[in-house]
């Protein structure tokens, strides 16, 4: 069974969807995804990782594997609780719990930004903010996630998916 959760973040965090079966998730609307505020990227990542590791420690059966997809149109600029080194350490620790993180960044060098926090370039994707490239990026996420679940391989974006996410 695949469960889906969705957290929005800027200078604060808002959990929009928690543990809904993937087939029951309704499509998001464009207004759901409008950027606003500043970007407390590291705090959002750190709080999310902390939540899921805590849940796993309380109940070892709560998930077999977990994929966390980070999508941002801004660079880190307002986190107070976490920094790049603490996030990098947390992401390394995630491997003990079969937690994978994937980074999608608009209007930035997503591969460079992901590397700062320990996410491999295979799991990072640049995308342009057009309807076509955003749709392409999320289709790539779906395909990559399916490949991982099907054959047990590490998550990675294919070269063709990288090309399709750019104008």
Spell out what each predicted region is:
Residues 1-167:
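Acidic, low-complexity intrinsically disordered regions
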């Amino acid at each position: 069974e695949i469960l889906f959760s969705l957290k929005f973040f800027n200078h604060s965090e808002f959990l929009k969807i928690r543990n809904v079966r993937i087939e029951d998730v309704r499509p998001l609307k464009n207004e759901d995804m409008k950027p606003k505020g500043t970007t407390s990227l590291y705090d959002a990542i750190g709080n999310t990782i902390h939540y899921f590791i805590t849940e796993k420690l309380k109940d070892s059966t709560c998930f077999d594997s977990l994929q966390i997809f980070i999508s941002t149109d801004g660079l880190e600029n307002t986190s107070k609780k976490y920094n790049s080194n603490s996030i990098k350490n947390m992401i390394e620790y995630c491997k003990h719990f079969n937690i994978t993180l994937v980074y999608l960044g608009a209007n930035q060098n997503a591969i460079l930004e992901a590397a700062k926090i320990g996410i491999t370039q295979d799991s990072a994707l640049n995308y342009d903010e057009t309807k076509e490239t955003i749709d392409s990026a999320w289709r790539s996420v779906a395909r990559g996630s399916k490949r991982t679940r099907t054959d047990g391989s590490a998550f990675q974006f294919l070269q063709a998916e990288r090309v399709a996410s750019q104008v």
